[in-house]
């Protein structure tokens, strides 16, 4: 249902050249709900315990790269659909952008994200800043937990 709605809105957005904030205002809550449900499912899987263990390491050099990639693969498996939705809705978002959003949403620490994405923490800070420009504030805040 959400995918059909997104496809319709994306079509009308492309035809009318309406700003993303406007065209997507009515489905932002549905996207956020889809994120929440996926997180609920992810948390119930064994891979989530692995994520929690890896998050305890506060030094990115001590994080096992293979384990970090395995957890990231688990995130990809769980959030593929919602990541695809975000890319359809917000055309400026890259695959890595939406994957980073999903990883942060499920609880990746800065250090773990740095290892999993093979990027410095500084590069990830810049990515987050670029993502903030691309997403409506309600979705950005829901993903990054900037508003309670």
Listing of model-derived features with the role each one plays in the protein:
Residues 2-96:
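Membrane-proximal linker segments that couple transmembrane helices to downstream signaling/catalytic modules
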Residues 56-148:
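Cytosolic nucleotide-binding catalytic cores of signal-transduction proteins
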